[in-house]
Swiss-Prot record:
Pfam family, one: Trm112p
Source organism of this protein record: Ehrlichia chaffeensis (strain ATCC CRL-10679 / Arkansas)
Family: Belongs to the UPF0434 family.
Highest taxon of the lineage: Bacteria
Any one GO CC term of the record: cytosol
Name of the protein described by the UniProt record: UPF0434 protein ECH_0194
Annotated signal sequence range: none
């Protein structure tokens, strides 16, 4: 289970912008960087190399 309060402190490591939680994919989305960071076992993986690139 993902704790939404974490969105108040986490930012995109690339752009430093706020993130959005996608419930369907269980990812944190950076709209500006067009990256989706996975959440594994309730832990956001905020490594750029682990992020999935979003389609244009």
């Amino acid at each position: 289970m993902f704790d939404h309060r974490i969105l108040e402190i986490l930012v995109c490591p690339l752009t430093k912008d706020k993130l959005q939680y996608n419930k369907d994919t269980n990812e944190l989305i950076s709209e500006k960087a067009k990256l989706a960071f996975p959440i594994r076992d309730g832990i956001p993986i905020m490594l750029i190399d682990e992020a999935r690139k979003l389609e244009e």
